[in-house]
Structures are given as C-alpha cells and as structure tokens.
C-alpha cells in the first residue's frame, strides 16, 4: 500500500474514534459508537423474532416459566445504567446451555441452560450479565467496529484490486461481530454482579456460573456446538478468579433454590425426552437410521 493510502486510513481511524465516541451508560467511560440509539433499538426489534426462530423458537409448554424469568430479568434491568430500554426476556426451546442479548435489551435464555442452573441466584447472574451487554451498548460497539472494518475492506479493494484483502478484512469483521471482547465480558461480569447484589442475590452464584461454563468449555466430549457457543461468551479462569475476588467483598444474599426448582419443574420432568430427541437427531444426521429410531 502507498504511504498516502496508509496515512488516509490512519487519519480516518483517528477521526472516527474522535467523532464516533460516546459515554458508556454503565461505566461512564468513552467507547466507540457509530450506531445511534434509535438504530440500535431498531436492529434489536427486527432481529429478536428471527433469532428466536432460528434457535428453537419460544418455549411454550410452560408459560409460567417465561413469566418467572421475565420477572427476574425486569427487576435486574431496572437497576441497570439504562432502565428505560424496552427489555424483553424469553425462554427458548433449545438444549444448548446459552443466553444472549441483542441491542436494545432483547434477551433470551435457553432451556438447556436453565436445566444446568441450581437456583434463582444463578439465574440472576446469567440475566444480569446479559442486561449489562444491552445497557452498556456492547452490541452497538461491535457493530461500529464491523462498520469500520467493512469500510477498510472497500478502501483496500479500490486501492489494490486484490480480492484477498477483501476476504481477510471480511473475516475480521465477522469475527468481531460474533464475539464479545475480553474487556466487554469482564465488564458484563462486574456490573452484572452489582445488579444481582442490589436485587438481593448471593454474588457467589456468579462464580459458580463461570465455573460451570469453564468446565463445559474444557469437556472435549461435548462436540463442536460448545465451541460455537463459547465463541460469543468465552469463559476463562481469569473471569472465575475476578468474580471470586469481587464476590468476597460483597454481602451474601438470597439463593431462592426452592422457588427456582419449582419454576423449572416441567423442563426437568421433560429433560430425558429432550435428550432422547437430540440423540435421535444426531444419529439421523449421520444417516444411522436404526440408532435414530431406538
């Protein structure tokens, strides 16, 4: 690349950083944002239903479970840096132990994760973490970085005429938009614990949650779907240790184990049937029809 082009790219990056920064509503720090709040809300609203449908759809067998999860989520959301976002919380009929947040406060948690949790405090740890991603505009920040990379791709294409540059930059854009960074995950852990403690929950539940995710990430028998899961929420020993240190400084709170076990009773009753179904699907994909039918 020519020196002039490199200087132009550098200048654009600096200019974008200056004009595209905003104050993080949760931390009070400056962060990149080329996406307006209105655009962010629109993206979340437009993608919420399609995202649900592509991941098993809403869990409708026990409507009271959705209400239970939403009540806890809304309580935590009111304590966030953006309490007036149009938050929604839904349970998805999906075996993968995952939860996610779209821009604008559109949050989902899978049936497969609810099965692994032991009490309401652990559920609050999950939902508090996702609320931070939404309130801190992490999704908007990811989209902004993707926009800069896409612009860089276009500039490189025009300057070089070489599609290889486009492919490399395109992969980078996809990777950034599909994965929260280390700082964003630590931020969501830290402030998520704040929210759950303010709501009266035991912060050690957040430690237990990360220990569970770390154990799953190290279990090679679980297959590639776990690699895809942890691409968006990468667990680490660092996160476990930071959560431990933070929880040790905070007051103990409620666990609400009995209430949680009661709320999740139906999915626990049905868990063996779901496991059988998933095994059958796996065998069918291998065209092992006899195994799929047993």
What function would you assign to each model-found segment?
Residues 2-294:
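A Zn2+-metalloprotease active-site environment signal
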